[in-house]
């Protein structure tokens, strides 16, 4: 079996599910696929946020400087941006189960290698410059692997859910990054505090391997590959004009739509602030506000938890309070996130007040 055959979208199964079992089988497989992909995507973020937790120990041991850590982090973000754009198109044609599992498995392997490299650093071991180069290359590779998580997860919604239910399930799926960040800051932070920064990468790798297994065990590519009818036959929904178009033609329409590029630019600015807090918040709290590692990671973990609340709250606010107007809540949330971030950066306060600042910030960004 070639690489193309391995990753291309699954063919319909010749063994059809008996009609009397179709409804029950579809519901069971749909739920397994959705919750499997959702849980696994949260573990993608554990493999992405590990570096954010170990920055101060790396600086304290004289292995890397803050500037070098910034370059390493940028390697992931730049590669991730390109990869997410490209993989978003590629995933339309792929077996999303294998595609998603591959990305998380290699991301876990990258974390494991980075943790292992720490055991070879020292006066008689690897020099700091070599560690820096290795980390930058590996973290860039991780960026590409991370870009293989969201596209297949979103595509699973279109393959398994009718149009009328996709919004609800997407709001749940889109909250998983905050769940992953929360797990990373709490669990990885505890491990690093107890055993050292090397084990922060190792525990992230373990989480990634668990996530890969979850995908392989619970996620299914398409209803047709399991002997079920297509989602349109299952739901009784009629195909729209767009549904009947070839994937390539739809992709061209998306690229030519100016609104997509405006949203993309807005999203880019939101992510700059989001990753500033998620990626550097722990180090900022340690250096600028003298919090120990355990408390710093706990504070940023609250940020992630309230991001979930904001994401889930967004749909309800715009539908119920603002009567379907998406612009007003977006503007209000943007102003609120600015105020909260300014308080976090410039206001004083202890443990509780800093939890309040970052929670307010993530609540607002979650709505955005």
Please give the residue ranges for each predicted region.
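Helix-to-loop junctions at the C-terminal end of transmembrane segments
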Residues: 83-95, 311-324
């Amino acid at each position: 079996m070639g690489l193309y055959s391995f990753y291309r979208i699954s063919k319909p199964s010749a063994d059809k599910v008996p009609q009397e079992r179709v409804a029950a089988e579809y519901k069971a497989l749909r739920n397994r696929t959705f919750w499997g992909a959702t849980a696994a995507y949260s573990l993608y973020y554990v493999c992405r946020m590990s570096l954010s937790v170990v920055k101060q120990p790396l600086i304290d041991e004289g292995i890397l400087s803050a500037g070098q850590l910034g370059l390493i982090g940028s390697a992931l973000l730049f590669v991730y941006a390109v990869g997410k754009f490209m993989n978003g198109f590629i995933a339309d044609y792929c077996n999303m189960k294998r595609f998603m599992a591959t990305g998380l498995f290699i991301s876990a392997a990258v974390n494991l290698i980075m943790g292992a490299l720490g055991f070879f650093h020292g006066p008689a071991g690897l020099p700091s410059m070599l560690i820096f180069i290795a980390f930058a290359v590996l973290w860039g590779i991780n960026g590409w692997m991370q870009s293989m998580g969201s596209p297949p997860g979103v595509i699973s919604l279109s393959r398994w859910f009718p149009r009328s239910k996709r919004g609800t399930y997407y709001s749940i799926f889109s909250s998983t990054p905050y769940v992953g960040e929360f797990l990373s800051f709490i669990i990885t932070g505890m491990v690093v505090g107890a055993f050292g920064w090397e084990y922060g990468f190792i525990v992230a790798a373990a989480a990634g391997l668990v996530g890969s297994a979850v995908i392989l065990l619970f996620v299914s590519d398409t209803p047709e590959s399991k002997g079920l009818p297509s989602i349109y036959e299952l739901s009784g929904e009629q195909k729209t004009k767009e549904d009947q178009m070839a994937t390539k033609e739809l992709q061209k329409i998306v690229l030519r739509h100016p609104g997509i590029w405006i949203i993309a630019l807005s999203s880019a600015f939101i992510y700059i602030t989001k990753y500033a807090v998620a990626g550097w918040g722990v180090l900022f709290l340690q250096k600028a506000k003298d919090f120990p590692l355990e408390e710093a990671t706990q504070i940023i973990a609250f940020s992630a938890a309230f991001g979930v609340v904001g994401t889930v709250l967004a749909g309800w606010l715009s539908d119920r309070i603002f009567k379907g107007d998406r612009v007003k809540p977006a503007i209000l949330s943007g102003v609120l996130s600015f105020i909260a971030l300014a308080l976090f950066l410039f206001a004083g306060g202890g443990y509780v007040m800093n939890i309040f600042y970052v929670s307010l910030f993530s609540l607002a960004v979650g709505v955005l």
